[in-house]
């Protein structure tokens, strides 16, 4: 069990009524809480969401606070400071004065910094500190008026092969405020991608998806991501750039296995972080299994850190892998099914 969940279980006497667990890890916490606690989970991680449903828990997969009332909330501190700001805001917009909010996180994950942010809503108390985790309690003294989701957007402009795109990114989305180096290395090659049904695996804020849609109005883009904030950001990016929704298919995925089949191309700057930890499972799975989702002669385009052994993985499953460029620590890899 996640050590943060162990801390919650040890202090479960503080919990009562309808309790919302926010950003909770996918473990046995909900099933081990006392039955008199009516626990629900709000998550934006699709893999975790599926895990909670399979375990029989009440779970919500969304970027917005669930549409029901709660007596208490437990916030598992996210990696992103901006995302924590958003979560605190929506919690303080939905809970009432004198209700309880709990904050739990790893010390290396910024729980002490997060606790300081909690202080602006009332007096806080540290309830537990063990297994490199801390649990804090707040009795709400100050609430907030809900702001629209759009007010949390960051926008910036990207120039791609003579096309100017406006990128919209919500809190917690990869490269929320600027173009990342890996995607920048990949962008000049997007005009070579085969037209048709194209999947953007790990779509993030929708930079790759948006360019491919604007480049050819007959392209159908399957924007795939595990994160609800990424999918919502991609939809907002399409809208901001005047691209019709008929070109966009948004799909939450746990990995490449959930992707559509018979695709003309898969393009990806694959994810490698899960919370504060590095995790290459999704990107390695993409290299190993992408061919199953492509038509004959379908294309795989990936940008990845040069130190990763993806060319070997891709060659093993495709029979070949071409390195299109090696620039600024990143390689653009190409293979044809």
From Swiss-Prot:
GO terms for cellular component: cytoplasm. The keyword Repeat does not apply. Pfam families: MTS, MTS_N. SUPFAM superfamilies: S-adenosyl-L-methionine-dependent methyltransferases (SSF53335). It is found in: Cytoplasm. Its main location: cytoplasm. It comes from the Bacteria. Keywords: Cytoplasm, Methyltransferase, rRNA processing, S-adenosyl-L-methionine, Transferase. Its EC number is 2.1.1.172. It catalyses: guanosine(1207) in 16S rRNA + S-adenosyl-L-methionine = N(2)-methylguanosine(1207) in 16S rRNA + S-adenosyl-L-homocysteine + H(+). Specifically methylates the guanine in position 1207 of 16S rRNA in the 30S particle. Belongs to the methyltransferase superfamily. RsmC family. This is Ribosomal RNA small subunit methyltransferase C. It comes from Acinetobacter baumannii (strain ACICU).
